[in-house]
Amino acid sequence: MRERMHNLVPYVIEQSGGGERSYDIFSRLLKDRIIFVDGEITDAVADLVVAQLLFLESQNPDKDISLYINSPGGAVTAGLAVYDTMQHICPEVQTICLGQASSMAAVLLAGGAPGKRFALPSSRVMIHQPWGGVQGQASDVCIQAQEILRLKTLTIAYFALHTGQSEEQVREDMERDFFLSAEQACSYGIVDTVMKRRKHAQV
């Protein structure tokens, strides 16, 4: 299904003094400093997003980047690679949730530049503790369980940092799937504004 969807990516034609040039729609949006995080956050997806962030920084280190998020989450380490890059680069990263930002995707949403984190009205956010299948001999299970707890502590700290909630409150909320509407995510501090309509298109 996903391969079929990728085969349906539209192309746009641009006219210039040198003639016509065609772009797939995502490459065209990248020219306007727009990046999409779509679907599960895997190592491959994280690599692509990080590469685009670094490329846009090299093009203009002073101009904002817009990160549109519609994702159920994914691998914690992959998500943290994107998160760390967002915090590391010079341009401020504006985050916009459409559809959903769940699990690690919610960390990326909250990690946008202060005052520049948005959610569309019908979107939702979900936070929960990291999870993973642990198997093997007892010593390996213990090591993996400790790593899961370390990642949980790390994500709690990041949510607390960006939302203004206490770590105790975030820890309590993350014990189970914790769903928030766009307005609730705004009240919680994950986003700053529920975006209704903008006056001028960026593209």
UniProtKB/Swiss-Prot annotation:
Keyword Cytoplasm: yes
Active site: 103 (nucleophile), 128
Keyword check for Secreted: no
E.C. code: 3.4.21.92
Main location as per UniProt: cytoplasm
Enzyme class: hydrolase
Cellular component aspect of the GO annotation: cytoplasm; endopeptidase Clp complex
Compartments, as annotated in UniProt: Cytoplasm
Role, per record: Cleaves peptides in various proteins in a process that requires ATP hydrolysis. Has a chymotrypsin-like activity. Plays a major role in the degradation of misfolded proteins.
UniProt family annotation: Belongs to the peptidase S14 family.
Protein known as: ATP-dependent Clp protease proteolytic subunit 1
Organism whose genome encodes this protein: Treponema pallidum (strain Nichols)
Gene label: clpP1
